[in-house]
């Protein structure tokens, strides 16, 4: 059996949160970062398997200021040596799946193979509606369970996961889905340079792009 920790990244004590707008107070955020560093160092030394955190945005109230999962992962990683750093996780409705795969691969290198990944559908409507990558997407929760919005979100999520996994496993790929196409159909790179055709793959001498891949390889 393995044990891990999970945090929501709450910036204030109860009385500080109840004063309002705690998330906008730099001194509280700085204190939280310092405390997270101490938690990570202790958990690492105590032998915990991993330390997890979510992706949430626009949290002016201060309850869940995890923001960019990559930045928080690097903060945790910089204060630990052995345990996994786990994001729970990249919110599909707010992220480009190809870029997500690239971030995962890059972070795993930077963390020495210690990056753990979760992919999720997104349930906090306030920030998802402001960050979503496609207009037809919505956050999901009890208020819209088993509705068309829920079905679209689930269908999109399945494609998102498939693209992330395909990009991580493939040297290059051509993915034509319902929501995403990588590379875009009939795309010709206007930056005409022989480096693309001579030292890569998936591009012809006319700069027509038929395949694309992430770098580095995980």
Where are these regions (language model features)?
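Short, well-ordered coil/turn segments that N-cap beta-strands
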Residues: 1-3, 47-50, 80-85, 111-116, ...
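N-terminal beta1-alpha1-beta2 module of alpha/beta enzyme domains
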Residues: 1-79, 83
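A cross-domain feature marking catalytic cores of carbohydrate-active enzymes
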Residues: 5-9, 55, 87-89, 115, ...
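Active-site mouth loops of central-metabolism enzymes
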Residues: 18-34, 90-98, 145-146, 218
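Acidic, glycine-rich active-site loops and adjacent beta-strand->loop/helix elements
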Residues: 56-58, 64, 89-98, 121-125
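Outer membrane beta-barrel
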Residues: 79-86, 92, 100-101
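Internal, glycine-rich beta/alpha segment that forms the wall or movable "lid"
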Residues: 99-218
């Amino acid at each position: 059996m393995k044990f891990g920790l999970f945090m929501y990244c709450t910036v204030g004590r109860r009385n500080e949160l109840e004063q309002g707008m705690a998330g906008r107070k730099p001194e509280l955020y700085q204190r939280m970062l310092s405390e997270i560093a101490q938690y990570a160092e202790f958990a690492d030394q105590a032998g915990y398997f991993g330390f997890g955190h979510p992706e949430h945005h626009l949290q002016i109230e201060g309850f869940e200021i995890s923001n960019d999962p990559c930045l928080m992962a690097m903060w945790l990683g910089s204060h630990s040596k052995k345990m996994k750093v786990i994001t729970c996780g990249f919110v599909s409705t707010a992220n480009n799946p190809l870029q997500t795969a690239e971030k995962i691969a890059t972070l795993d290198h930077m963390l020495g193979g210690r990056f753990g990944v979760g992919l999720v559908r997104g349930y906090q409507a306030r920030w998802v509606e402001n960050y979503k990558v496609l207009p037809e997407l919505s956050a999901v929760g009890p208020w819209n369970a088993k509705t068309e919005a829920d079905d679209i979100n689930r269908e999109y999520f399945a494609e998102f996961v498939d693209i992330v996994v395909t990009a991580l496993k493939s040297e290059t790929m051509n993915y034509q889905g319902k929501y995403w196409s990588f590379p875009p159909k009939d795309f010709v790179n206007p930056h005409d340079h022989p480096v693309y055709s001579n030292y890569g793959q998936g591009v012809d001498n006319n700069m027509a792009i038929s395949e694309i891949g992430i770098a580095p390889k995980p």
